[in-house]
Swiss-Prot record:
InterPro entries named among the record's database cross-references: ClpP/crotonase-like_dom_sf, Enoyl-CoA_hyd/isom_CS, Enoyl-CoA_hydra/iso
Catalytic activity: a (3S)-3-hydroxyacyl-CoA = a (2E)-enoyl-CoA + H2O; a 4-saturated-(3S)-3-hydroxyacyl-CoA = a (3E)-enoyl-CoA + H2O
Pfam families noted in UniProt: ECH_1
MF terms (GO), sorted A to Z: enoyl-CoA hydratase activity
Species of the source: Mycobacterium bovis (strain ATCC BAA-935 / AF2122/97)
NCBIfam families: PRK05870.1 (NF004525)
Broad enzyme group: lyase
GO biological process, one term: fatty acid metabolic process
Functional summary from the UniProt entry: Could possibly oxidize fatty acids using specific components.
Encoding gene per record: echA14
The protein, known as: Probable enoyl-CoA hydratase echA14
Amino acid sequence: MAQYDPVLLSVDKHVALITVNDPDRRNAVTDEMSAQLRAAIQRAEGDPDVHAVVVTGAGKAFCAGADLSALGAGVGDPAEPRLLRLYDGFMAVSSCNLPTIAAVNGAAVGAGLNLALAADVRIAGPAALFDARFQKLGLHPGGGATWMLQRAVGPQVARAALLFGMCFDAESAVRHGLALMVADDPVTAALELAAGPAAAPREVVLASKATMRATASPGSLDLEQHELAKRLELGPQAKSVQSPEFAARLAAAQHR
């Protein structure tokens, strides 16, 4: 299997393009990838030349979720620290002070769906698939998924996804408000959309996003709501990770 830098970062015309880059494993989230994704977001935020961020996946998948071997590791050890490390990258996208776009080129599954949901806007490629899949694996949702999905599509569609296993292809994602549009080349479309903040004064872009966060739900910032959801989900997800049911489903998935 080829070796890759797990996260790539390039900057052009005031836009940072961040690519999760493990195509042989469908960009599954590992501790290393998660940490490098946070570092890439922080580099973009700290670069005065960057006005917006686009996140995408290398190869055919956007992000196939958490690395199953990482999820199943450390049997008997507390699961919470492992889960928090896997959350770290998409939480950095969620808290990014710059406008963010997820160019969803393929499957966004589990934690990969969280990565897409963490962005301000999602653009779907023709092969995009949005699939929570937590329940199918015997897992409780985590990383603020319950809050992010309800924010994006409302409570009924979010419950259809998380409780009933509903998935969304590119067209249905747009129909339900999960994605802004379908584009043959979602990265190109995302870069074109990002030309808006790229042409604006950076301080205005930063202030506009900060104000939208504050006014989305008066009385609290959306970041605070995401953190609360993450904390509420962490215990039940950790319990489910350590359950015999998850172990059996993990073993079955690894032997397919």
